[in-house]
Amino acid sequence: MAGICCGVVGETEPAAPVDSTSRASLRRRLDLLPSIKIVADSAVAPPLENCRKRQKRETVVLSTLPGNLDLDSNVRSENKKARSAVTNSNSVTEAESFFSDVPKIGTTSVCGRRRDMEDAVSIHPSFLQRNSENHHFYGVFDGHGCSHVAEKCRERLHDIVKKEVEVMASDEWTETMVKSFQKMDKEVSQRECNLVVNGATRSMKNSCRCELQSPQCDAVGSTAVVSVVTPEKIIVSNCGDSRAVLCRNGVAIPLSVDHKPDRPDELIRIQQAGGRVIYWDGARVLGVLAMSRAIGDNYLKPYVIPDPEVTVTDRTDEDECLILASDGLWDVVPNETACGVARMCLRGAGAGDDSDAAHNACSDAALLLTKLALARQSSDNVSVVVVDLRKRRNNQASS
């Protein structure tokens, strides 16, 4: 590059001693800058669409946008294209059959007006095959106190659920999901204890705000709303105040109920366990936690429990999309409004359409819902997952 730039200089200006303080010298140097930039862009820079450095720069630029937008959906779209490109002719049919029922998804996760990002999102299409059917895993985790419990849930919960489902008898989804959440909570608790006793792993300790040391670490927890989508059913497990909403024929159907301390049945359970609900900026367990169930939060046990409430919903031809989100969205956007926004974005893309517009529709819906929450002054992290459920309807019609 230096040689090219010197060639441009030699062609446009004869070499001669120049007084660096003179006005003419400054003018000549300024005149050279556009030429050097043009040469660098045209002769040195690699094609933009194949440039890894450009991708890294775009990631840095995007991370500086308001809310630190996490555009994981675009990455997944690129991965899908790459996966399709490397499929050889002999395995095209097999690959198409494997991925034919994978729903299109979009996800957005932003820090919002909070200082720290404590939300986490987990997306694992086709994480399990059972009875020759693909099962898909989606989860949103809203951490509090620190982010490491939510991050641990993102890394491990789908594996725990997979192992439990593989040994599940018939369709005992409620028992299976309760066991999975309890094991996740046990892993989090053991991890915290081992790190304190044996000396924490330094790399993780340095990256954690609470430094994974008691008593701060015992005050860390996370909500968890998880959905396992099969060709026939939608299983939702909820622990905390994140929420899952199904949009069916234009109607918003909540598939989970928020675990708030002042919910009558939760209030009775907390009081029977010997705890109290104190109203301090809203109802809180012992005046501290604004939810009655969560993974982690060892210092509030047995009042705060990790047991999820599980709903199993049969899929129908009228199902349009599933929305999973943290309370950063639901605190300011009603279920019906969220459903309407998602339907509006999906309307332009037909069910079963594999065009770029169809793949971007869910991403647009998640992004628009996030922007709406921020515009309505949401004060929390906002994480949204939108799953297009319409593909199954087209597959049935064509068969």
UniProtKB/Swiss-Prot annotation:
Residue span(s) of domain PPM-type phosphatase: 104-389
Alphabetically sorted, this entry's keywords are:
Abscisic acid signaling pathway, Hydrolase, Magnesium, Manganese, Metal-binding, Protein phosphatase, Ubl conjugation, Zinc
What's the protein called, per UniProt?
Answer: Protein phosphatase 2C 37
Q: Which gene encodes it?
A: PP2CA
- Quote the function comment for this protein: Major negative regulator of abscisic acid (ABA) responses during seed germination and cold acclimation. Confers insensitivity to ABA. Modulates negatively the AKT2/3 activity, which mediates K(+) transport and membrane polarization during stress situations, probably by dephosphorylation. Prevents stomata closure by inactivating the S-type anion efflux channel SLAC1 and its activator SRK2E.
Q: Which reaction does it catalyse?
A: O-phospho-L-seryl-[protein] + H2O = L-seryl-[protein] + phosphate; O-phospho-L-threonyl-[protein] + H2O = L-threonyl-[protein] + phosphate
| Residues annotated for Zn(2+) binding in this entry | 146, 148, 208, 210
Post-translational modification summary for this protein: Ubiquitinated by RGLG1 and RGLG5 in response to abscisic acid (ABA). Ubiquitination of PP2CA leads to its degradation by the proteasome.
Does Metal-binding appear among the keywords? Answer: yes
Q: What InterPro entries has UniProt attached to this entry?
A: PP2C, PP2C_BS, PPM-type-like_dom_sf, PPM-type_phosphatase-like_dom
Q: How is this protein activated or inhibited?
A: Repressed by PYR/PYL/RCAR ABA receptors in an ABA-dependent manner.
